[in-house]
């Protein structure tokens, strides 16, 4: 930012005519990092420089900043975010604050997450819906343990795009060597997380350098993008990659002639005539109608709240999942997962909890397997997990559970664990896959592999006998050419 721009920074920017947004999909991002790295100040600066601050907010900011000005005489931009009284008194972020801003290229939803270790669970909440993480690092302090913890949680929650915002670079006299060392250290750590898409930016959130406007006047050695330029080029995760998913929230029966299944589409798309399967029962039906509040739709996509009407009477209850018949989630009694422990009592080995995913709630036994060592990025064996620990666990269900892996569908691959005694939410988790060493398909005894026409297979799967033993089966739909290749490569005695 130029000296002239800095001098005039306390003046509310003049309003400009609204510009067309080229990408209509908002980018959801979080700011995270350790305590006092400048997360709230950065978002406040973003809001200010993108003209997302209203006149009354600007006046309040000027008033509340009285007596709190820094050495540059600039407002305390963090006050635009820290809304709780406790946050203002302590000068920290506790809750997750969501703010909205836009440029002429796209719109953004940003979550300011707390940096203190005891509020890690709040950070996990903010990360669960984000497409990109802005990880702040104090240029004077480098990578800290909480920095690693937040990066790990963001990665586990499916975030693959990171901006490493090396903040307060002005307090190091714009030290290029320090910036490059921090960038190198983080990239080395990120390799253990499988994160490769990292943009490192030196910046001063307070001065606004490399946030919205270029800081090249102060840092001629940096020729990369600003934060906003990076955000404008980021990609939004799509829920269309998997097949149709609808977690039934309510069965609607306003009259004898109507029966519909209500919920929000969690993946893919659906249209009248599509064949669907109800899980965990395995019953098959066709979609006859898609209804919203006041319309009959010819299609629905992820994010739409709909009422689905089927062409036959089937047993569907709240918590069941209606899915595309040719792209099914995993169903079984045992799954692997990764969790973040959220309560002081942690996760006790072998204890039974309530697991809630979507609108379905089931009893589950949780067995900790390993805990992530944040300093090394390695997994160490563990029998219990305490608050803020990141761990791998084995989930064992009494009845068949239905999930997608979290990296394929956030909605149908995530869950929370509830203590049945206290009703506290003790963990948030992500399904990594169905356990390969458990379940009916691996029981002793012979197995039979069949290759059937799709219509015949649908009839068999709709039978009561098949439905009663659905958790003992594995179904894979392939093309005729793929089936021929499988059988050609199979052993001769199959």
UniProtKB/Swiss-Prot annotation:
GO MF term set: ATP binding; GTP binding; GTPase activity; sulfate adenylyltransferase (ATP) activity
Region (G2): 91-95
One annotated GO biological process: hydrogen sulfide biosynthetic process
Keyword hit for Acetylation: no
Keyword GTP-binding: yes
Region annotated G3, chain positions: 112-115
EC number(s) from the headed UniProt entry: 2.7.7.4
Domain tr-type G: 24-240
Annotated GTP binding sites: 33-40, 112-116, 167-170
Function: With CysD forms the ATP sulfurylase (ATPS) that catalyzes the adenylation of sulfate producing adenosine 5'-phosphosulfate (APS) and diphosphate, the first enzymatic step in sulfur assimilation pathway. APS synthesis involves the formation of a high-energy phosphoric-sulfuric acid anhydride bond driven by GTP hydrolysis by CysN coupled to ATP hydrolysis by CysD.
HAMAP family with a match to the protein in the record: Sulf_adenylyltr_sub1
This protein's name: Sulfate adenylyltransferase subunit 1
Record organism: Rhizobium tropici
Gene assigned in the entry: cysN
């Amino acid at each position: 930012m130029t000296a002239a721009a800095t001098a005039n920074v306390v003046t509310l920017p003049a309003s400009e005519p609204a510009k067309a947004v080229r990408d209509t999909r908002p980018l959801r991002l979080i700011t995270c990092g350790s305590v006092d790295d400048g997360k709230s100040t950065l978002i406040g600066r973003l809001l200010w420089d993108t003209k997302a601050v209203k006149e009354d907010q600007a006046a309040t900011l000027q008033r509340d900043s009285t007596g709190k000005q820094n050495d540059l005489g600039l407002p305390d931009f963090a006050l635009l975010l820290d809304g709780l009284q406790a946050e203002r008194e302590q000068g920290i972020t506790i809750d997750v604050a969501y703010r909205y801003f836009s440029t002429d290229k796209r719109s953004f939803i940003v979550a300011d997450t707390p940096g203190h270790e005891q509020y890690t669970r709040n950070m996990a909440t903010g990360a669960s819906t984000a497409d990109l993480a802005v990880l702040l690092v104090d240029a004077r302090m480098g990578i800290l343990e909480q920095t690693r913890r937040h990066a790990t949680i963001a990665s586990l929650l499916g975030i693959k795009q990171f901006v490493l915002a090396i903040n307060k670079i002005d307090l190091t006299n714009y030290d290029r060597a320090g910036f490059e060392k921090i960038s190198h250290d983080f990239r080395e750590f990120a390799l253990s997380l499988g994160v490769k898409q990292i943009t490192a930016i030196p910046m001063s959130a307070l001065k606004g350098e490399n946030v919205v406007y270029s800081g090249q006047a102060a840092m001629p050695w940096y020729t990369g993008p600003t934060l906003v330029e990076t955000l404008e080029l980021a990609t939004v995760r799509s829920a269309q990659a998997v097949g149709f998913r609808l977690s039934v929230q309510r069965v609607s029966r306003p009259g004898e002639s109507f029966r519909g299944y209500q919920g929000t589409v969690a993946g893919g798309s659906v249209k009248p005539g599509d064949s669907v399967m109800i899980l965990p029962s395995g019953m098959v039906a066709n979609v006859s109608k898609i209804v919203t509040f006041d319309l009959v739709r010819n299609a629905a996509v992820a994010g739409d709240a709909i009422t689905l009407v089927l062409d036959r009477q089937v047993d569907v209850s709240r918590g069941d999942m209606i899915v595309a018949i040719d792209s099914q989630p995993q169903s079984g009694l045992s799954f692997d997962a990764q969790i973040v422990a959220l309560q002081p009592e942690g996760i006790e080995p072998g204890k039974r909890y309530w697991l809630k995913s979507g609108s379905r709630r089931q009893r589950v036994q949780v067995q900790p397997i390993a805990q992530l060592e944040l300093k090394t990025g390695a997994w160490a064996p563990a029998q219990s997990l305490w608050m803020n620990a990141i761990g791998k666990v084995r989930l064992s269900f009494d009845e068949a559970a239905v999930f997608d892996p979290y990296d394929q569908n956030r909605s149908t691959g995530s869950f929370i664990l509830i203590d049945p005694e206290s009703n506290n939410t003790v963990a948030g988790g992500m399904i990594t896959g169905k356990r390969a060493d458990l379940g009916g398909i691996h029981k002793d005894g012979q197995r039979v592999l069949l290759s059937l026409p799709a219509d015949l297979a649908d009839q068999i799967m709709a039978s009561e006998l098949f439905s009663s033993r659905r958790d003992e089966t594995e179904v894979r739909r392939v093309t005729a050419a793929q089936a021929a290749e499988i059988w050609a490569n199979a052993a001769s005695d199959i």
